[in-house]
Amino acid sequence: MLEIGDDTRIAKQVKFNQGEHTTLRVGDRTQIYRGGEFTGDITIGDDVFINRDCYVRPHVTIGDRVNIGPFVRLITDTHEVGPHERRAGAVRHDPIVVGAGSWIGASSTVLAGVRIGAGAIVAAGSIVTEDVPDDVLVAGVPARVVKRLKG
């Protein structure tokens, strides 16, 4: 099921892959630019801006007033380590939460199970493998706190 809020603009080229028992909720006054792909249960808040070609997997929650740069990936898929014959074992989806007012820079990747705190900034090109506290700037591969921001 697809639920779209008031005054929300979604480019025609955005792809939604929703199953029979999944819901994508997009809040009011949100913009999603072309080329994005959104799969499974996803909640996107109010006043969110998602730039072009973002890839979002199931079990993602994006808070209000979040900005997401182009080519960002929110990847909830992860695998158990399997036996020698096939190391990528059973798949699961660990949720990602993006806190209100945060900003994820271009070409960043956020991996399964991560929480990005409210008001945090993820610098462009970062790979986020661990939780990010509120009101910090993280950067790098893997992303690390480089600056505390004023609240």
Q: What are these model-predicted stretches?
A:
Residues 2, 9-112, 141-142, 149-150:
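Flexible, glycine/small-residue-enriched loop-and-beta-strand segment within the central core
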Residues 134-136, 144:
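Glycine-centered loop/turn positions within well-structured domains
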Residues 122, 140:
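Conserved G/P- and acidic residue-centered "switch" motifs that form tight phosphate/ATP-binding loops
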Residues 126, 142-144:
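A short, acidic, flexible beta-alpha connecting loop/helix-capping segment that sits on the rim
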Residues 67, 120-121:
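Short alpha-helix at the nucleotide-sugar/activated-sugar donor binding site of glycosyltransferases
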Residues 58, 106-120, 126-130:
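Beta-rich strand-turn-strand
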